[in-house]
Amino acid sequence: MEIVNALGRRKTAVARVYVREGSGKILINQRSLESYFPSSILRYVVKQPLNKLGVSEQYDITINLKGGGYKGQSEAIRLGIARALIKINSKDKPLLRSEGFVTRDSRKVERKKPGRPKARKKFQFSKR
């Protein structure tokens, strides 16, 4: 099997995912998954598509990450891994879609508007 690549995005995080047959190693920006994401919850999010299909020990995954925070990055990786697994075996798509791993979460931070302190917050209104 050759290398399969896919792209995952979430908020401002962009994850380029490269999947090849191997023993289950995950490298993020040349660092191990455990050193990049100290939180077990974020590591769980990254591995969700692999665990759902039961293939966590079959593939080596290399990821280039840019932008965003830890949460956005982990969810971008999850989307990228799910897309790569679908490229490898398209029969897995319904199972991954039912778990919500294939859907791109398009929510982003709303921009600040002029004349307001934040995007939707307004300055205190004084009637008199």
Swiss-Prot record:
Keyword Phosphoprotein: no
GO MF entry, a single one: structural constituent of ribosome
Recorded superkingdom: Bacteria
PROSITE patterns xrefs: RIBOSOMAL_S9
Signal peptide: none
InterPro entries, sorted: Ribosomal_Su5_D2-typ_SF, Ribosomal_uS9, Ribosomal_uS9_bac/plastid, Ribosomal_uS9_CS, Ribsml_uS5_D2-typ_fold_subgr
Renumbered residue ranges of the record's region Disordered: 106-128
GO biological process, one term: translation
Key word Ribonucleoprotein present: yes
Transmembrane segments: none
Gene3D superfamilies documented for this protein: 3.30.230.10
Compositionally biased spans, kind Basic residues: 109-128
One Gene Ontology term, aspect cellular component: cytosolic small ribosomal subunit
Recorded family membership: Belongs to the universal ribosomal protein uS9 family.
Protein name: Small ribosomal subunit protein uS9
Lineage, top ranks: Bacteria, Pseudomonadati, Bacteroidota, Bacteroidia, Bacteroidales
